Amino acid sequence: MNEQEPAPKRGRRFKEQTPVQRALGLLVRREHSRKELNRKLLARGIEPDAAQAAVDRLTGEGWQDDARFAAAVVRNRAGSGYGPLHIRAELGTHGLDSEAISAAMATFQGDWTENARDLIHRRFGEQGPIDLPQRRKAADWLARRGFDGNSIRAATRFDP
């Protein structure tokens, strides 16, 4: 009897992706800052010069834009209940300069005090914090979320 030999397995061979392709794959999922994109490429074993060249090329072609990234972060974090101080600090960690951060913060169309009030109403109900310990708790919570003193006072009814 002839035993049939199993056919050799045909595995797909994937070409090694170029640094530009890898960077584009990251950008397709979500926006990235230049610093963040460069860091992720380096973490994936791409040479520093090749990573920088890929980021420069994608920036030049319009695939990567720090202003667009910053505006998306502001919109996302403000919608998630974070205040301007928290958002500014986060944008700073992404390697954006103060001018880019200010421009991104200017894209916010809402009112920070109203955002703080909405958060307080969701957390404490429509009546808001009633007694002093609740007001302190609410103020501390808003401060941890990055709201400034004026917004906190207005939201917790410290203003007369």
UniProtKB/Swiss-Prot annotation:
Alphabetical GO biological process terms: regulation of DNA repair
Statement: the UniProt record of this protein carries the keyword Cytoplasm: yes
Record-linked InterPro entries: RecX_HTH_1st (IPR053926), RecX_HTH_2nd (IPR053924), RecX_HTH_3rd (IPR053925), Regulatory_RecX (IPR003783), WH-like_DNA-bd_sf (IPR036388)
Pfam families in the cross-refs: RecX_HTH1, RecX_HTH2, RecX_HTH3
Recorded GO CC terms: cytoplasm
Annotated compartments: Cytoplasm
Keyword line: Cytoplasm
Taxonomy, superkingdom: Bacteria
Described function: Modulates RecA activity.
Protein family per UniProt: Belongs to the RecX family.
NCBIfam families: PRK00117.2-1 (NF001054)
Protein name: Regulatory protein RecX
